[in-house]
Regions:
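C-terminal regulatory or interaction extensions
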Residues: 1-220
Length: 220
């Protein structure tokens, strides 16, 4: 069945019972095209943004993750899930520091977590052909490799893939600083701006001190 559940959690892990931390829980059902577009539109509203002052003196806004990467995770799960497995759905789980997409079925063909960047196989070729006609996939087998490259270019950890007997888990993560905290672009730029301000203040203070000492020496 074509159904996707998107869950947004408050924090970095899923909790249950009295500590349950689910803040959004939406289920999307429908034809493949509408389902895919609806899921992508909703997930985009849940991706955090960071606004900071760039080196050119202009404010910039970056998303937590490159848009292509989380889009690729969602689209691939819909295109390649094992639709013969009943009783469970695709689940997109969004946490403060990572996104995990769970897709029913093991990796198809000869695709394995260790060769997923190079190996390509369509479990559902008719669905893939249909999605390609609407430019949701290209079927060149380069999407996962591009995702790895875009995460690296953004300074983020490499995507992670693992599987068990009937489920594939794909995860993208935020970078963390030395203290284990999620480091946003604002943190990096804060350091840069701090260094720049320190240099500027140092120059200004140096000039003022020089002028003051010069005046004192002249008076004496």
């Amino acid at each position: 069945r074509a159904q996707v559940r998107v869950i947004r959690y408050d924090g970095t892990e899923a909790k249950v019972g009295t500590e349950m931390n689910v803040v959004k829980d939406e289920i999307f059902i429908g034809p493949i095209l509408k389902l895919t577009n609806d899921v992508l539109a909703f997930v985009k509203t849940q991706i955090k943004e960071h606004t900071y002052l760039g080196s050119d003196g202009r404010f910039r806004t970056d998303e937590q993750y490159p848009e292509f990467c989380w889009t690729e995770l969602c689209v691939n799960s819909i295109c390649h899930r094992d639709y013969s497995i009943l009783g469970t759905d695709i689940q997109v789980k969004l946490f403060d520091d990572h996104i995990t997409v769970e897709s029913p079925g093991i990796l198809p063909g000869l695709v394995r977590p260790y060769n997923i960047r190079e190996m390509h196989f369509s479990r559902n070729p008719k669905i893939a052909l249909y999605m390609r006609s609407y430019k949701l996939v290209k079927e060149f087998g380069e999407g996962v490799d591009r995702m790895f490259r875009e995460m690296a270019e953004a300074g983020l950890p490499a995507p992670e893939y693992r599987q068990n007997e009937f489920m594939v888990y794909a995860t993208i993560r935020q970078a963390k600083d030395a203290a284990g905290q999620v480091a946003g672009n604002g943190d990096v730029n804060g350091d840069v701006n701090g260094d720049v301000n320190g240099d500027v203040n140092g120059d200004v203070n140096g000039q003022l001190n020089g002028q003051l000492n010069g005046q004192l020496n002249d008076n004496s």
